[in-house]
Amino acid sequence: MVTAPLLGWVAVRPIPRLSKLNTCKYVSSSLQSYKRSVGSCLGKQQSRDFSYSATLTDAGINLEKTRNIGIIAHIDAGKTTTTERMLYYSGFTRRIGDVDDGSTVTDFLPAERARGITIQSAAITFHWPPLAADGTSSGPSLEELESQNLPRSRASHTVNLIDTPGHADFTFEVLRSLRILDGAVCILDGVAGVEAQTEKVWHQASVYQIPRVVYVNKLDRDGAAFGRTVREVGSRLQGWPAVCQIPWFEGGNGRFTGIADVISLQGLLWKEGGDGKSVKVFDLAGLENEDKRLAEELKHARVALVELLSEHDEDMVESFFEHEDHLKVPPMTILKSLRKCLLGPEAQKIIPVFAGSSFRNMGVQPLLDAVNNLLPGPSESVDPEISLGNSKGSLGNLLSGELTLQQEPKTANIAKPKQKKKTAVAPTSVDTKHLAANLESCALAFKVVSDAKRGVLVYVRVYSGTLNKGCQLYNTNLHVTERAPRLFKMYANDAVEVDSIPAGHIGVVSGLKYARTGDTLISCTGSKMTPPEPLNTLQLRPIDVPPPVFFASIEPHSLSEEKNMQEALALLLREDPSLHVTVDEDSGQTLLSGMGELHLEIARDRLVNDFKAKATMGRIEIGYRECVLGQSNPVTKIFDREVAGRKGKAGCTAVVEPYDPESGEPSSGGEDIIFAEIVEGNRIIISAPGINISTDKRGKEESSSLPSQFDVNSFRTSLYNGALSALARGPQFAFPMHNTKVTLTCNVVEHLFGSDSSASALSAAARLATQGALRDLATGQNSGTGIMEPVMNVIISIDEASLGAVVHDISSARGGHIISLDEEMPISTSIGGNDSPESEQVVIDVNKIYAPPDPFETPSVAGGLPIQASANQTRTITAKVPLKEMVGYLKHLRSLSAGRGTFVMHVDRFERMSAQRQKAVLAELHR
C-alpha cells in the first residue's frame, strides 16, 4: 500500500494485486511518486469521489465555487475542534489548534481561551481543496466536472466559515450569523445525541430556510451511539435522516477506526494517532475481505439511502429502474439527488448525516467534500427578503424589475378594525424597474467589533453588486452616508486588506462611525450623497434582538471616570445589541441588561479588560416588568418651553389600559388611526383627527393639515418615540412596562401650534401625557400596576435514574409546570414573530428510519430500533419555570443527576406575579 500526504488529504485505494491488505504500510512520498506507483500497478488510476486528486481551479471570484457556511451545535459538541481541523487540512494553518491548550484560531478572545468556550462568532476564509503553493489553481470548471460526471469537490471552493457559540446565553451571536449564511453544518455529540440547544438552533435555522448537513462527532468515545443519534435526528429535528456514512469500529465493537461511505460504497481507514492526512480506501470487494460485517451493513445502508431518495426525487426512481440494483446506482446520481432534495422544496425533509471524530482527525475531509458537493452557493440560496417603502418583496425581484410597490393610500402597518363599508380606494402602483440601474451594491451589517488596532470593524454580507473601497455607503436605517475607506477579508483575528467585496461574500468595512448590527448599507450610481426615493428606504430583513432578562448596575470608580465608562458602554452595545443600557432616574444608577449571567460576566470582562473602563459591576438581578391593572382617565399635556434655544409647543392626550396579547386581533379604534403596532410587548395606537392623509404619485404620504415642518412620517415617529420613552419606566416599581395599551390622540387643530410645534416638542408632549396617564392609574383607588416576571421554557436532559428527582424539584420547589417528557413537541423558536416554515411538520415514523446498529447491538437494519433501547437512555423534560427559580440551577441539577444533567432555557413570556410572590420579590429587591 502506498499513500502520500497532500496539503489536504490523500485517500489511497488498496492495490488489488496484493494478496494481503493488512500488509499495507503507510509510506510518505511525493504526489508524483504516488501516481507512478499506483499507475504502474493499476494501469489506470481509479477515481474517488473525494478531493484528494483534485487539481484546483481558478481561485478567482466564482459564486458557484463559494460557500458561506456556519458551524452550529450544542456547547461542547466539537464545533471549534472541527473548525481547527478544517483549517489545518485546507493548508490555512500548519498545526492543529487545541481548545484545552487555548491555541485555537477562531477562539482568540482571552475570555474564550480561559473558559474553553466560544463567546463570539468568528469568520474565516479558506479554500477546499487547498490551493496550489503559488495561490493559483488549474483544475476543471464546474461545467467540465459535470460533463465528466465528477463531483464538485474536485474543484477548489472558497469557504467562508463562521464558528458560532453553543452556550444559550449567546443566542444572539448565533442568530446574527444564521441571518447571512447559505448553509450550515450541525455537529452532534455521538454520546449525548441531539441536545436541547442543538434542537433550538436547528429550528432557528429553519426559520431562515438554511440547508444543513449533520455531522455526528466524538464517535471514538465510550458510549458513542451513531445509530441512536440518527434516530434522534429524525424524531427531534423533524426530518428524514439520509445516512451517507456509517462508522467503522474495529472488529465491530472495538475502537473507532474509520467510516464506510454509503454513496461511493467504499471504506475509509485512518492511521491511528496520525494527523488524518493519510487514509486507506477499500472498495466494496476489499471491504468484504477486511470487515465482512461492515460490508454487509454498508449494503443495507445503500439500499436504505436509495429508497429514501426515491420517495422524494423522481430522477432517482428512474435511475433505479435503469440499473435495477440499489448497489449499481452511480455515486454521482446519488450526490445530485441529495443536493436536489437539500436545496429544493424537500429541503426541510431530508437531512444528510455524516460520521467522524474530529479530535482523532477522522472524517473531517469527507465532511468538507460534502460542503462543496451538497450545500448551496450564494446564487442558489434563498432570495433575501426586503422592504421598500411600505411594501415587501425580495431583492431578486427588485434587481430584475419585477417588484411593484403597492402603496396604500393611508398606512400600511395598521391592523384595521371592522368598520362600516366605505368606497374602496385602489393602492397606487409604483414601477421599480429603474431602481435596479441605480443600485450599485446592497449589503447587510451583521456584526460590529471594536478592534484595538484597526478601530471599529463592521462585518457585512454583500447581497448584490460589488462593494468597492472608498465608495459612499448610505445607511437606510439611520439615513446617513459614510465613506468606506478600507475593506478587509477576515481570518479570525487577522485581516487582509482588499479592494472590493463581491456579491455573495463576507467581508469587513473599517472606518464607519454609525453602522450598527442589522443595518442595510447601499451604494448608488451618481454623485448624490442620498439615493433617490424610494431606494433610500430599501432594507434587508433585520436581525431580531431577543429581550434581556438579567441586569446589573455599573458604577465608575470616580466621577472623572464616568465619561470613559459611558464611551466604553457605547462601544460594547454597538458590538452586542442584545445588551441594553438604561439609567435609573431615582438612583442615577447605570444598569446593564443581558441574556444571562454568563453573558453579563463576559460583558463586564470586556468592559474592564478590553475597553479599559474603570468601573465595577454590581449584583446580577432579574429584569422584571410592570403592567397596568385598569384603565386610566384621559390625560392631556401641553409641552411649552424652549428646546435648544428655540420655542417649542405641542400637545397630546393619552389613555393607558391593559393589553392581552392572547385575546386575538385587538381593535385599534376609529378611522383616524395612523399607527397601531405591538412594540416590546406593548400596543401603541396613534390617532390624529383631522389629519387627512393622501398619497402622491411616488407613493409618499402627505397631509395639508400639518404644519410645513412636519411630514406624516415625522409626525407619527415623534408621537411613537414619546410613548416608547414613557413606557421604559413604570410609575410604581420603575420596571419597563409590559402588556400595556397606550392610545395617543393628537388633534392637528387643537394640539399643534403652527411654527412653534416641532418634532422634539411633540415627542415630549406624548411622553408627558403617557407618563401622566400611568401616574393617574397608579394613584387610583381600584387599580394600579403589578409586577410581571420572565417565565422560561426550560429543556432539561438527564438520565432515567434522575428523572423522578428532577421532575419533583421542578414542579414543587421551583413552582414550575411540566409540559412534556422526551420532547413530544418541537421547541418554539419564534424569531421576531415570524413563523417557521416548519409549521407544516414532517411526520416521522421512527420505526421506518434506517440506522446502523451501535456497538454491542444486534445487527439489523432497515427497520431501526426503538428510541428507548437503552436503560441509560437520556430523558428530556420540557417545563415552564419562573426565571428567578432558575438562577444558579445548573449546580443544583448536577447534584440531583450525579453530574450528568444539562439544561437550556429561553424566555417564553412574562407572567403577572401573585400578590404573595410580588411582596417577597419587592422585599428582596429592597434589601
Swiss-Prot record:
Lyase in keyword set: no
Annotated organelle transit peptide span: 1-57
All residue ranges annotated as the tr-type G domain in the record: 64-379
Molecular function terms, GO-annotated: GTP binding; GTPase activity
Alphabetical list of Pfam families matching this protein: EF-G_D2 (PF22042), EFG_C (PF00679), EFG_III (PF14492), GTP_EFTU (PF00009)
Single GO cellular component term: mitochondrion
Signal peptide: none
Biological-process GO terms, alphabetical: mitochondrial translation; ribosome disassembly
Cited SMART domains: EFG_C
Gene3D superfamilies: 3.30.230.10, 3.30.70.240, Elongation Factor G (Translational Gtpase), domain 3 (3.30.70.870), P-loop containing nucleotide triphosphate hydrolases (3.40.50.300), Translation factors (2.40.30.10)
Keywords from the named record: GTP-binding, Mitochondrion, Nucleotide-binding, Protein biosynthesis, Transit peptide
Domain of life of the source: Eukaryota
Sequence positions that bind GTP: 73-80, 163-167, 217-220
Similarity comment: Belongs to the TRAFAC class translation factor GTPase superfamily. Classic translation factor GTPase family. EF-G/EF-2 subfamily.
Annotated function: Mitochondrial GTPase that mediates the disassembly of ribosomes from messenger RNA at the termination of mitochondrial protein biosynthesis. Not involved in the GTP-dependent ribosomal translocation step during translation elongation.
Official protein name in the record: Ribosome-releasing factor 2, mitochondrial
UniProt gene name: mef2
